[in-house]
């Protein structure tokens, strides 16, 4: 769950807090504020807004250290954040819309090539995929604190494993192996297709996975 609310310091389980931390959502820098990295939530309260944001760890799809525009924390939420007056656009019509795409642009059946249609469908799928997530950056004034923030986030997220990836007694080992490969491909796609330096994201889990594969 992601809540837009007045954020107070957690009473229990606080691992890290710091002031002068900028939060960037998508292409927008929301402002500067205080971050609270706790066992159950990742929260940020801006200094110039009444409300902040509180995020349960299960909503964080991945996190790591980015170097663009400078060393900072990058993390991705598994859905689109709507923060009234701050971030998030209302749903837009039509997605085939380089020109605002109306129905007339989609009626050209039989005259266009199948290859062109497949390209359009792929681009629409990519747009839809990234429309369902929110890319976020925590940018501290002191970049030397990034490693400490990353360590605290890793510790907290490890306390909340994704239930969808948990082992099952009825699971098929071959299917499980395929699932791991699919997950790796999805993460690679996210790193490749992401914006604003996401391709520079360093994830320890990925590095260990590839090292194990080499062995």
Swiss-Prot record:
Q: Where in the cell is it found?
A: Cytoplasm, Cytosol; Nucleus; Cytoplasm, Cytoskeleton
Q: Residue ranges under compositional bias (Acidic residues)?
A: 105-120, 167-190, 203-215
Cross-referenced Pfam families: Voldacs
> What coarse category fits the chief subcellular location reported for this protein?
cytoplasm
> What keywords does the record list, in alphabetical order?
Chaperone, Cytoplasm, Cytoskeleton, mRNA processing, mRNA splicing, Nucleus
InterPro entries under this entry? ICln, ICln/Lot5/Saf5, PH-like_dom_sf
Superkingdom of origin: Eukaryota
Q: Which Gene3D superfamilies match?
A: Pleckstrin-homology domain (PH domain)/Phosphotyrosine-binding domain (PTB)
Biological process (GO) annotations held by this record are:
cell volume homeostasis; chloride transport; mRNA cis splicing, via spliceosome; spliceosomal snRNP assembly
Q: Name one GO cellular component term.
A: methylosome
**Residue span of region Disordered:** 88-120, 160-215
Q: State the similarity comment.
A: Belongs to the pICln (TC 1.A.47) family.
Function according to Swiss-Prot or TrEMBL: Involved in both the assembly of spliceosomal snRNPs and the methylation of Sm proteins. Chaperone that regulates the assembly of spliceosomal U1, U2, U4 and U5 small nuclear ribonucleoproteins (snRNPs), the building blocks of the spliceosome, and thereby plays an important role in the splicing of cellular pre-mRNAs. Most spliceosomal snRNPs contain a common set of Sm proteins SNRPB, SNRPD1, SNRPD2, SNRPD3, SNRPE, SNRPF and SNRPG that assemble in a heptameric protein ring on the Sm site of the small nuclear RNA to form the core snRNP (Sm core).
User: Subunit comment for this entry?
Assistant: Component of the methylosome, a 20S complex containing at least CLNS1A/pICln, PRMT5/SKB1 and WDR77/MEP50; may mediate SNRPD1 and SNRPD3 methylation. Forms a 6S pICln-Sm complex composed of CLNS1A/pICln, SNRPD1, SNRPD2, SNRPE, SNRPF and SNRPG; ring-like structure where CLNS1A/pICln mimics additional Sm proteins and which is unable to assemble into the core snRNP.
User: Under what name is this protein listed?
Assistant: Methylosome subunit pICln
Q: What is the source species?
A: Drosophila melanogaster
- The gene from which this protein is expressed is icln
